């Protein structure tokens, strides 16, 4: 009987958990999981295990959480697992070449963009914010650079006009798990043909910063609507209303109307307030006042009685 191929999986968030769950359905043996150390989360700031750790423990897979993989201890830990392949999905650490080279078949990465577009930490949100019409998953052979290795497999899907980072994330995660199965089957059969990335087409998906989510009403409404979707579920687009924070969870673009300054409420309609932008107007369909739950635009208009001419921001 042929021995099962030994896989070590390195990943941390929900996207990686979905990939790990799909991987576990295959014939390979997942002999260990590397994930980020437990971090404080929530209002109580209690330590919380990553989604990948929770999935691995439930499956009885050994879990390792080094603060850094650039130590000799991390290298020896990986060596002790004798992996045939290392699979990395949104792990959260840059892995040194010594780690990548240790498995007999090297290391591969599942990345949520059509490389070389959107290398880096936030490819899903950046694709939506930029107005891209399609996204996808690329699986690449890892090397020391940031998401720079040759592409082994690519799957595409359209970005819907109402896609948020959350909805696109879930579709890409499922797609990534299925694409990984194709890659593993071809890897063991030695059918893969790596394709180098074109350096001229590289773009970077830098990590999202909370200050980016503050809506600048001088921008076109179409740009702001994309940002609302790109920053949902985190860090969430926001503005100020009567000097208090107001999160914007859903919005839609309306045509120009009136000559109010950007940020001014130009109308209060049944579906929500309409705000003048640098170009066209934005209607706020779902908002969250500071310290409150999410309200529909109509409930917000009824409860807070915003007035035409009031300024947001």
UniProtKB/Swiss-Prot annotation:
Function recorded in the entry: Attaches a formyl group to the free amino group of methionyl-tRNA(fMet). The formyl group appears to play a dual role in the initiator identity of N-formylmethionyl-tRNA by promoting its recognition by IF2 and preventing the misappropriation of this tRNA by the elongation apparatus.
Originating gene: fmt
HAMAP family: Formyl_trans
Residues involved in (6S)-5,6,7,8-tetrahydrofolate binding: 113-116
Transferase found in the keyword field: yes
Reactions catalysed: L-methionyl-tRNA(fMet) + (6R)-10-formyltetrahydrofolate = N-formyl-L-methionyl-tRNA(fMet) + (6S)-5,6,7,8-tetrahydrofolate + H(+)
Lineage: Bacteria, Pseudomonadati, Pseudomonadota, Acidithiobacillia, Acidithiobacillales
Key words, A-Z: Protein biosynthesis, Transferase
UniProt cross-references to InterPro entries, sorted A to Z: Fmt, Formyl_trans_C, Formyl_trans_C_sf, Formyl_transf_N, Formyl_transf_N_sf, Formyl_transferase-like_C_sf, Met-tRNA-FMT_C, Met-tRNA-FMT_N
Pfam families: Formyl_trans_C, Formyl_trans_N
Gene3D superfamilies recorded: Formyl transferase, C-terminal domain, Formyl transferase, N-terminal domain
GO CC entries: cytosol
The family this protein is said to belong to: Belongs to the Fmt family.
EC id: 2.1.2.9
Entry GO MF terms: methionyl-tRNA formyltransferase activity
UniProt name for this protein: Methionyl-tRNA formyltransferase
